[in-house]
């Protein structure tokens, strides 16, 4: 499907990914002004279940899942014991006993090993779901567009950072067996949805999107959209060498429940008070392109462009 649409491919963490389908600029503007569809099946999906799943999530995540209700989502980080960022992710709560996590593809081994190491103390199990893929439909017209494709009134049932399961009787436009996971989340700064299902179901939805003249969007525009929206990319804007506070992500470290213990809590408390570095946005006044690794010098201070 991607090749037929004129995709140019690049290697991204071992995945052959469409970088664009002809014009990265047009794709970027399409998402800002209308709607576009991304194949982001390179992302990793982990499912967790068991009577202590909520307790496990409260321990391993910097953010606190106690603040969300069933069928809501939360952005968070996982860190090592020193507070270095392993990955950023979105966690989805079905109920206290069942959660889903979507994390980056480049950190698969680190994230899987992190969960495996820390889950032993809890009555909880987890599994990786390579049989599932993800489509992202993003843009100001994404709700109307996806509702039409699925023949389902999404606006009635799903708010920002929440999700639902749709079953086949609700989706006459995509005949399939089983269910479909739809969240109102994204990585563009626009309204949007992410759809998780098996690859056969997603192929049907992709084809329906294309038939409705929804533009396919490549990795290049995905990157410029998230930069424009001020969203970090793990491995570029942050890494295991960085803590949440210097990465402008202190807001996802939740200290509000003083009784909650979580990984690196003590170290992160100290870092919060002493941190001297900070990730900030930069606007170029004149024509030109800022490249990763370039130095920015002001008075006696020196910084470096990350994205």
Predicted regions and their residues:
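Conserved, structured C-terminal
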Residues: 1-13, 17-19, 25, 93-307
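Acidic, proline/glycine-enriched N-terminal capping motif
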Residues: 1-79, 84, 220
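N-terminal glycine-rich flavin-associated loop
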Residues: 40-52, 92-100, 138
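Short, surface-exposed charged micro-motifs
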Residues: 88-90
